[in-house]
Design a protein with these regions (language model features):
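Short, positively charged interaction helices/loops
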Residues: 6, 41, 64-67
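Charged, low-complexity intrinsically disordered terminal regions and linker tails
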Residues: 1-5, 45, 56-57
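Short, contiguous, helix-prone interaction/anchoring segments in small proteins
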Residues: 22-53
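Short, basic amphipathic alpha-helical segments that act as recognition/interaction helices
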Residues: 49-67
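A detector of short terminal or domain-flanking linear segments
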Residues: 1-27, 34-35
Protein backbone atom coordinates (compact mmCIF):
# COMPACT_ATOMS: atom_id res chain seq x y z
CA UNK A 1 0.00 0.00 0.00
CA UNK A 2 1.28 3.48 -0.80
CA UNK A 3 0.46 6.87 0.75
CA UNK A 4 -2.32 7.71 -1.70
CA UNK A 5 -4.06 4.37 -1.14
CA UNK A 6 -3.74 4.80 2.61
CA UNK A 7 -5.43 8.22 2.47
CA UNK A 8 -8.17 7.04 0.10
CA UNK A 9 -8.93 4.07 2.36
CA UNK A 10 -9.66 6.41 5.27
CA UNK A 11 -6.85 5.10 7.47
CA UNK A 12 -6.68 6.59 10.95
CA UNK A 13 -3.93 9.11 11.80
CA UNK A 14 -1.93 6.59 13.82
CA UNK A 15 -1.70 4.21 10.85
CA UNK A 16 -0.72 7.04 8.53
CA UNK A 17 1.99 8.24 10.90
CA UNK A 18 3.30 4.71 11.34
CA UNK A 19 3.43 4.22 7.57
CA UNK A 20 5.31 7.49 7.07
CA UNK A 21 7.86 6.75 9.80
CA UNK A 22 8.53 3.15 8.72
CA UNK A 23 10.79 2.02 5.90
CA UNK A 24 14.49 2.15 5.38
CA UNK A 25 16.35 5.45 5.48
CA UNK A 26 17.38 7.00 2.20
CA UNK A 27 19.66 9.96 1.57
CA UNK A 28 18.30 12.97 -0.31
CA UNK A 29 19.69 16.31 -1.40
CA UNK A 30 17.60 19.46 -1.20
CA UNK A 31 18.52 23.04 -1.96
CA UNK A 32 17.36 25.57 0.61
CA UNK A 33 18.62 29.02 1.57
CA UNK A 34 21.55 28.94 4.01
CA UNK A 35 19.69 31.12 6.51
CA UNK A 36 16.78 28.66 6.52
CA UNK A 37 19.12 25.72 7.08
CA UNK A 38 21.07 27.46 9.83
CA UNK A 39 17.90 28.59 11.60
CA UNK A 40 16.40 25.11 11.37
CA UNK A 41 19.60 23.57 12.77
CA UNK A 42 19.46 25.99 15.72
CA UNK A 43 15.76 25.26 16.30
CA UNK A 44 16.44 21.53 16.22
CA UNK A 45 19.24 21.90 18.77
CA UNK A 46 16.95 23.89 21.07
CA UNK A 47 14.44 21.02 20.88
CA UNK A 48 17.11 18.39 21.51
CA UNK A 49 16.85 16.83 18.07
CA UNK A 50 18.87 16.66 14.89
CA UNK A 51 18.24 18.72 11.78
CA UNK A 52 17.23 15.54 9.94
CA UNK A 53 14.73 14.62 12.67
CA UNK A 54 13.21 18.11 12.47
CA UNK A 55 12.83 17.84 8.69
CA UNK A 56 11.27 14.36 8.99
CA UNK A 57 8.86 15.61 11.67
CA UNK A 58 7.86 18.55 9.48
CA UNK A 59 7.25 16.32 6.46
CA UNK A 60 5.19 13.89 8.52
CA UNK A 61 3.18 16.77 9.98
CA UNK A 62 2.38 18.10 6.50
CA UNK A 63 1.48 14.67 5.14
CA UNK A 64 -0.81 13.99 8.11
CA UNK A 65 -3.01 16.99 7.25
CA UNK A 66 -6.34 16.14 5.66
CA UNK A 67 -7.18 18.89 3.19
Amino acid sequence: MNYRELIKSGADPTDIQRFLADGEMTAITIRIPKNLRDSAKEAAELRGMSFSALVRAGLIQQLMKRD
